Design a protein with these regions (language model features):
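Feature responds to low-complexity, polar/acidic, surface-exposed segments characteristic
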Residues: 2-32, 38-91, 98-161, 173-207
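C-terminal cap/linker of serine protease catalytic domains
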Residues: 201-217, 265, 269, 299-312, ...
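Conserved active-site neighborhood of the chymotrypsin/trypsin-like protease fold
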Residues: 231-232, 250-331, 335-338, 356, ...
């Protein structure tokens, strides 16, 4: 009992330490604002105060710039009907309202000087990207949480936003794709001539190399804690037999973990960074020798709320990796919560009897509970799945290549965890 209380206390302390500040840090905000100025998304203003609360009118103007609408502000003669919008924001407000991105506080009032809250701003961003609150993609009251869950924002925005918060969220949105496409916001801006590829490249936005902090902000929400149950009694008592890790590879809930993580389990749940828990529905692919599995996670959580999308990671495989390359591991060490660690690749093809494919040896720290997590390159792409370690080795951690998942047919109906357990039990009898 004491051990479980201590683990719970440690988890709470880690969570408290991980909670981001309510507003953008001044130094970071200035860097983001400078970058957006170079991209012509913010007006040049040496005296700008990024700590001041953002207004609804400012948000409308920045939203339209981010969409590339200011370059070609075609409103089809549309007038939103708001009588209180100042001249400098009128075209942007009409443009955004015409497309259903923003609305007023009444039929004739926009409240341009009203302070902007996180849910209102994230709802604007999401609509611009093709998500709809009207068709159930998100709820306005939950827009900021949804934006964080899908990786649009690097942290969950809360409360009244500052101009620095807007700069941060716009910067975060640059490498986010429009819904259902492979087109990023930045690539569309370049196509429209709002900014140039040379400017984006000079800012390090093309073929982006992330720092550990940037990867954590962007992709930690794509990983989850996997809780496993091996008996009906454990399921009934809601006491898991083990914890592991996993990560999403598609917005609709496809995810990867180790096979040994789900071995012998009859039920599994995935708990996200924000604390929401979703049940594992099916196993679409697994290989006991490679020690890898693809699972399908329900989009309805245990509170019976459904999400339209999850943040997810791209798979790139191991073809281009070399010893000495920096890597990052994300997972659930010791079951105490999602975390990131950094290291380098020591060997790209280490053979072990335990695995059917050569493993990647690296020095990014993992612990019990990290099995099934993602090993990332500096671009935030998955090269392997964290799997184990040498007990007596210093910084010798093992990861299995993700390449088989890239070649697998994931359109099959798959099996339940109980069916996988029965299939493997029958094989072992033979």
């Amino acid at each position: 009992m004491k051990k479980r209380l201590l683990s719970a206390l440690c988890a709470v302390m880690l969570l408290i330490c991980a909670v981001p500040m309510a507003s953008a840090q001044t130094g970071d905000a200035a860097r983001w604002a400078d970058a957006l100025t170079v991209l012509h998304l913010l007006s040049e203003d040496p005296g700008r105060d990024l700590t001041t609360p953002a207004t609804r009118a400012q948000a409308a103007v920045l939203l339209v710039r981010l969409a590339g609408g200011e370059k070609k502000p075609d409103t089809d003669g549309w007038f939103a009907g708001f009588r209180d919008v100042p001249d400098w924001a009128r075209t942007a407000v009409n443009y955004a309202n015409r497309r259903g991105w923003i609305s007023g506080v009444s039929n004739v009032q926009f409240d341009p000087n009203g302070h902007l809250n996180a849910d209102a701003w994230c709802a604007m961003l999401l609509r611009m990207l093709g998500y709809s609150d009207k068709t159930g993609d998100f709820e306005i009251s939950d827009a900021a949480a949804f934006a964080w869950r899908i990786g649009l924002t690097g942290r969950q925005l809360i409360g009244i936003l500052s101009m620095g918060d807007l700069a941060e969220s716009i910067y975060d949105a640059l490498d986010f794709c429009y819904k259902g496409t492979e087109t990023t916001v930045l690539s569309r801006l370049m196509d429209l001539g709002v900014c140039t590829a040379s400017a984006a490249n000079a800012l390090g936005l093309l073929n982006k190399d992330y720092t550990a902090r940037q990867l954590a902000d962007r992709y930690l929400s794509a990983a989850f804690q996997l809780s496993l149950y091996e008996t009906e009694e454990q399921v009934h008592d809601e006491v898991s037999s083990a914890d592991a890790s996993g990560f999403f590879i598609s917005a609709d809930g496809l995810a990867v973990t180790n096979y040994h993580s789900i071995e012998d389990s009859i039920k599994a749940t995935a708990t996200l960074l924000n604390g929401e828990t979703y049940e594992v529905e099916r196993v679409l692919y697994y290989d006991t020798g490679i020690d890898i599995a693809v699972i399908k996670v329900s989009r309805t959580n245990q509170s019976r709320r459904t999400t339209s999308a999850f943040n997810h990671l791209d798979l790139v495989g191991t073809a281009d990796i070399r010893p000495g390359d920096p890597v990052y591991a994300i997972g659930n060490p010791l079951g105490l919560g999602l975390a990131i660690s950094s290291g380098i690749i020591g060997s790209t093809a280490h053979e072990l009897d335990r695995y059917a494919l050569p493993c990647i040896v690296n020095s990014a720290d993992i612990s019990r509970g990290s099995s099934g997590g993602a090993l990332l390159n500096t671009h935030g792409q998955v090269i392997a799945v964290t799997s184990g370690a040498y007990t007596y080795g210093n910084n010798m951690y093992l990861a299995v290549p993700v390449d088989p998942v890239m070649a697998a047919d994931l359109t099959v109906s798959g099996w339940t965890l109980k069916e996988v357990k029965a299939i493997e039990a029958a094989k072992n009898k033979d």
